[in-house]
Amino acid sequence: MSNQAPFAAASGTFLIGGDLPVYRMGLGTMRLVGDYAWGECDDPAEAKRVLWRAVELGITLFDTADAYGPEIAEQMIGETLAPYAPGVVIATKGGITRPGPGQTEYVGRAGYLKQCVALSLRRLKLERIDLYQLHRIDARTPLEESLGALKELQDQGKIRHIGLSEVTPAEIEQARKIVNITTVQNRYSLADRRHEETLNYCQQHGIGFLPWYPIAAGKLLKPDQPGAPTLAQIAARHGATVAQLSLAWLLQRSPVILPIPGTSKVAHLEENVAASTLHLTPQEWAEVEAVVSL
């Protein structure tokens, strides 16, 4: 891999909803706020530099949520990047309240979601949100009510595309009877593949899959764990880190995967984007799969 940070274009392009192009390597913004998604981060100035550098590196997909901060990540994006560069796509989420650090409650009432969208538009300095994702399904509220509210806002031109987060194939099927679902955001990584069935469903139906926590290789990043030396050796062949290897694996795993690794440091951002140029050979892919199955 080159020492010069490449552009995100090397990761390839995906059309959200068939008409909204993004480079597949995106940026998640939860790390731009404090621990447990609460309050400001330790270095807000560096966090803003991350956003600027992301644009310079060609990243077009920025994923955020009103629950990050709460509100802080959206506000930082609006203050730092608006007016937005051509091609920049802002994806945000609503449907979670955060009473305190590490605390979450799911709220899917129609009136609440409409308010969430209105406030997100204001903070992000947008007239229309490119991709609005229901952050979690609220078991106390009929899905028809939650998604019906988002469909109404879509018809009004306030939302372009609608997505879901942390869902099963059955829930996606139910949702698609109400509104067109263009993306799904579930936890997924090289070492955490519990949502394999959901990813396969998304690939079958051309739905974008945004894996959150995509570098969470867990034990695979620890040198003293089984399989870790093998991953380190494969990464070293490419002049890369195991974290970069895990991102490259995601890009090769499925053409619908849109990794959104987060960071609060410019140097780490550049490392993540550089993973777009790493390509595993069939033999290396088999080696990685053998390690993951340990």
Language model regions located:
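Beta/alpha (TIM)-barrel catalytic core signal, keyed to glycine-rich beta->alpha loops juxtaposed to Asp/Glu
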Residues: N3-T13, I137-L294
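Alpha-helix N-cap and loop-to-helix initiation/capping positions
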Residues: G39-E46, I72, M76, T104-Q115, ...
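Active-site groove signature of glycoside hydrolases
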Residues: L121-A139
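Conserved beta-strand positions
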Residues: L27, T64, T92, L131-L134, ...
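N-terminal binding-site loop/beta-alpha segment at the start of enzyme catalytic domains
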Residues: M1-V88
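Short, acidic/polar
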Residues: E40-A54, G108-L124, T168-Q174
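Acidic (Asp/Glu)-rich catalytic clusters
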Residues: G17, G78-V89, L121-K125, R176-I178, ...
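N-terminal small/glycine-rich loop or linker at the start of catalytic domains
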Residues: G18-W38, A91-T104, R128, Q133, ...
